[in-house]
């Protein structure tokens, strides 16, 4: 049986922590074992890669920045102990929580198979839940505005951040189903845009749970593309986007 050296154990754990800081759920999943168990002790554990990703996505996707500062660490065999301050910036404010985590690594897959985090979850929830409630109750126009700002910055992870895990982005001839597929699509946008600029019209609210925005891509040399995006939003996350083109796709 292959066993991890302490340095390899640290490397695997810290790759997961870096993925969490990136807010890219695809990277997070890359370092989670399919049968991973994540427990915020003494609360019941979350079982399996998909469920753990959903647990983390609740706060990662609404964070503009994430930083998990390591205060101290130790490793032995396939186990690592990490004292941290987990820091999240949401809605313009920083929210931090002290954690002591015990991480276990699967040597065969080089993935994290178990996390036991010791944290005052009650105190953390008392501070974070009002923020999460406010973000979940935003009208569609506010959610879409945050997404459009990410498009202007050409930040693919931020572009995907406001989509639900099971959202669908529907463009002419193709639909992208699920957060990872949508993020993969947004990864291609900066290269495809090149030096072109996306110009958005005013966001048109269609009730509390839908919004529509017309856009135009102005490319050097006079070429242009245009269309309309209609967004459906539930609990602060985009669940469906329909893109209608007025010309060829960019």
Model-based region annotation:
Residues 1-34, 123-161, 165, 250:
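Short, low-complexity N-terminal intrinsically disordered segments enriched in polar/charged residues
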Residues 3, 15, 39-42, 90, ...:
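A general structural-boundary detector
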Residues 7, 18, 25-78, 156-209:
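A solvent-exposed, acidic/Ser-Thr-rich amphipathic alpha-helical stretch
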Residues 60-139, 143, 170, 183-250:
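A beta-strand edge to alpha-helix "cap/lid" segment located at domain peripheries
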């Amino acid at each position: 049986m292959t066993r991890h050296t302490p340095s390899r154990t640290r490397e695997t754990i810290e790759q997961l922590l870096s993925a969490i800081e990136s807010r890219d759920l695809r990277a997070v999943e890359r370092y989670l074992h399919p049968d991973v168990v994540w427990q915020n002790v003494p609360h019941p554990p979350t079982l399996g890669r998909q469920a753990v990703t959903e647990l983390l996505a609740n706060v990662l996707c609404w964070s503009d920045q994430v930083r998990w500062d390591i205060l101290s660490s130790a490793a032995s065999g396939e186990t690592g102990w990490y004292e941290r301050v987990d820091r999240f910036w949401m809605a313009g404010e920083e929210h931090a929580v002290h954690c002591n985590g015990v991480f276990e690594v699967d040597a065969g897959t080089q993935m994290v198979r178990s996390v036991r985090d010791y944290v005052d979850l009650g105190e953390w929830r008392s501070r974070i839940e009002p923020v999460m409630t406010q973000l979940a109750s935003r009208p569609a126009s506010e959610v879409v505005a945050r997404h459009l700002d990410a498009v202007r910055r050409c930040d693919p992870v931020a572009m995907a951040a406001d989509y639900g895990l099971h959202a669908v982005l529907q463009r002419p001839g193709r639909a992208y189903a699920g957060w990872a597929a949508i993020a993969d699509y947004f990864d291609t946008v900066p290269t495809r845009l090149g030096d072109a600029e996306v110009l958005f019209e005013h966001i048109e609210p269609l009730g509390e749970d839908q919004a529509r925005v017309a856009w135009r891509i102005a490319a050097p040399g006079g070429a242009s593309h245009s269309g309309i995006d209609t967004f459906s939003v539930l609990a602060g996350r985009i669940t469906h986007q329909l893109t209608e083109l007025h010309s060829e796709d960019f």
